[in-house]
UniProtKB/Swiss-Prot annotation:
Keywords: ATP synthesis, Cell inner membrane, Cell membrane, CF(0), Hydrogen ion transport, Ion transport, Membrane, Transmembrane, Transmembrane helix, Transport. InterPro entries: Alt_ATP_synth_F0_bsu, ATP_synth_b/b'su_bac/chlpt, ATP_synth_F0_bsu_bac, ATP_synthase_B_chain. It is a single-pass membrane protein. Residues 278-302 are annotated as: Disordered. It is found in: Cell inner membrane. It comes from the Bacteria. Belongs to the ATPase B chain family. The gene is atpF1. F(1)F(0) ATP synthase produces ATP from ADP in the presence of a proton or sodium gradient. F-type ATPases consist of two structural domains, F(1) containing the extramembraneous catalytic core and F(0) containing the membrane proton channel, linked together by a central stalk and a peripheral stalk. During catalysis, ATP synthesis in the catalytic domain of F(1) is coupled via a rotary mechanism of the central stalk subunits to proton translocation. Component of the F(0) channel, it forms part of the peripheral stalk, linking F(1) to F(0). This is ATP synthase subunit b 1. The lineage of its organism: Bacteria, Pseudomonadati, Pseudomonadota, Gammaproteobacteria, Alteromonadales. The chain crosses the membrane at residues 5-22. GO terms for molecular function: proton-transporting ATP synthase activity, rotational mechanism; proton-transporting ATPase activity, rotational mechanism. It comes from Pseudoalteromonas atlantica (strain T6c / ATCC BAA-1087).
């Protein structure tokens, strides 16, 4: 079969034209669309990678912040626990201290009450013993004992030292030779004369002689008229006598013994009770009666 070259060439040209047309109007738009789509997908993937990277950064940042917050929370919880423990310990210490102070105050109050009670009981016992002693001695007192007490007073008057002698002489001069005699029982005339004879030696104008020194207790026939006796009965003296002149007093009686005994006991007792009570020494003992305005000469005990 013979070849028709015109037809072959025409078909070749048609084929090439078809290829160009397909490429121009079909393949090229498809390829461009594929390229555009590929670029778009690549952009989307790039954006996704960027977002993923940002997300990773955010996650890392948030995890760091969470770790920091957890650390701060742990620190704050620890500080809160420490502060709570310190506050609790402080409250316990304060409560313990307050309780100890209350106990100490209560113990001190109880000791004070006990000391005051002891003081009251002992002072009451002292006064009761003193009152009983006075009562017993008062009941046992008689005339003979009273006479002996006066004799003892006269004997003591004759044995005064120089200072007491001078003080008694000044007291007589200041009183105008007026003497107040206080005793539990009335004085007999002989006893009055005996006292006057003894006191006469203390007159400024009196001159001692040997006859007067040898008859101290004898009742003189002519008592010194310059001395005036004023007698006063004082039952509290029990047995004894007090001579008062010019603000000066000379006493010799059983009541003096009892009073001195009471003073000695209280003098020993008061410092002890004041120590228990926490008082300074001599506190509460200052009173006007402790130092009377007149001078008192206490004759030493036999």
């Amino acid at each position: 079969m013979p070849i028709d070259w015109f037809t072959v060439i025409a078909q070749g040209i048609n084929f090439l034209l078809l290829l160009w047309l397909l490429k121009r109007f079909l393949y090229h738009p498809i390829i461009d669309g594929l390229d555009a789509r590929e670029k778009k997908i690549a952009g989307i993937l790039a954006d996704a990678d960027t977002c993923k990277s940002q997300a990773e950064n955010l996650r890392t940042e948030y995890e760091s912040k969470l770790a920091h917050i957890e650390q701060e929370r742990t620190q704050l919880v620890g500080e809160a626990k420490n502060e709570a423990q310190m506050a609790s310990q402080s409250l316990l210490d304060n409560a313990r201290h307050n309780a100890e102070q209350i106990v100490k105050k209560r113990v001190a109050a109880l000791r004070l009450e006990m000391a005051e009670l002891k003081q009251d009981v002992l002072q009451q016992n002292i006064h009761e013993v003193y009152a009983i002693s006075r009562k017993v001695l008062t009941e046992l007192a008689d005339g003979d004992l009273h006479t002996k007490m006066i004799d003892k007073l006269v004997q003591r008057l004759n044995t005064l030292d120089d200072d007491q002698h001078a003080a008694l002489t000044r007291a007589l001069a200041n009183s105008g030779n007026q003497i107040v005699v206080r005793s539990a029982q009335p004085l007999a005339e002989a006893q009055k004369k005996q006292l006057l004879a003894c006191l006469q030696q203390y007159l400024p104008s009196f001159k001692k002689d040997s006859s007067q020194n040898n008859s101290v207790n004898a009742a003189p026939s002519n008592p010194a008229p310059s001395i005036k006796l004023s007698e006063s009965i004082v039952p509290r003296l029990i047995n004894g006598i007090e001579l008062t002149m010019g603000g000066w007093k000379l006493a010799w009686s059983t009541d003096n013994y009892l009073a001195e005994l009471q003073e000695d006991v209280e003098a020993e007792f008061i410092p002890f009770t004041e120590t228990l009570l926490g008082l300074p020494e001599n506190e509460g003992t200052d009173n006007p009666e402790a130092n009377p305005p007149h001078a008192e000469a206490k004759i030493p005990h036999a």
